[in-house]
């Protein structure tokens, strides 16, 4: 379908495709995607629009973008969806949090696992409503049947991790994001469970 859209655009006087992408993902994906696309379709302009998950869905439904690249766990009616990858969700705790004593290793996985039951009534620092990670966090809370004692909402992952780093609460992150966050030396990461993807 993608190649078909591009082929149709090639016959126009100013061929272009419009791609919506999550703000956080744009940092790592746009340069690589654009380079490959320009090699294959040098005459087609790519117009990127960024936003959070809710904004991207609105753009797509209104027809202001042709494609979206995002973390999307729910089905969208009448939409062709291609899964590019699955990405693990990580729990982020301050390095001296007492729940770390309950962490356990599973096989050769790069991070230990931690049961969320040990974090009931804790302070969680989470993304804003409309962000894909917020949707994931809400699902994780529901599945684990825990209730945060306090929620602090922040729209930027770097700010969330900086708050976890100084012990203000617990956060969540994606495996693909943490390679840019090595500066947070006092954050310890844990897998939540085997099904905590997207």
Please report, for each region that a protein language model flagged, where it lies by residue.
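Short beta-strand-centered segments that line the small-molecule binding cleft or hinge
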Residues: 32-36, 53-96, 100-104, 160, ...
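Periplasmic-binding protein-like
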Residues: 193-198
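Short, well-ordered beta-strand segments
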Residues: 16-20, 68, 125, 171
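Secondary-structure junction motif
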Residues: 101, 107-144
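Hydrophobic hinge/microswitch elements
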Residues: 52-56, 61-64, 71, 132-190
């Amino acid at each position: 379908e993608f190649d078909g859209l591009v082929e149709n655009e090639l016959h126009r006087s100013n061929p272009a495709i419009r791609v919506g992408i999550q703000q956080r993902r744009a940092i790592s994906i746009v340069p690589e995607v654009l380079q490959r696309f320009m090699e294959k379709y040098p005459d087609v302009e790519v117009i990127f629009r960024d936003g959070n998950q809710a904004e991207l869905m609105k753009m797509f439904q209104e027809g202001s973008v042709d494609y979206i690249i995002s973390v999307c766990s729910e089905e969208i009616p009448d939409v062709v969806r291609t899964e590019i990858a699955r990405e693990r969700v990580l729990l982020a705790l301050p390095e001296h949090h007492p729940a770390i004593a309950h962490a356990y290793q599973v096989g050769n996985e790069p991070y230990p696992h931690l049961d969320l039951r040990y974090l009931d009534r804790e302070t969680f620092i989470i993304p804003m409503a409309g962000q894909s990670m917020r949707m994931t966090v809400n699902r994780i809370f529901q599945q684990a049947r825990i209730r945060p004692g306090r929620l602090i909402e922040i729209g930027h992952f770097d700010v969330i991790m900086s708050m976890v780093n100084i012990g203000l609460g617990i956060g969540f992150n994606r495996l693909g994001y943490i390679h840019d966050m090595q500066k947070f030396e006092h954050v310890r990461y844990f897998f939540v469970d085997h099904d905590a993807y997207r």
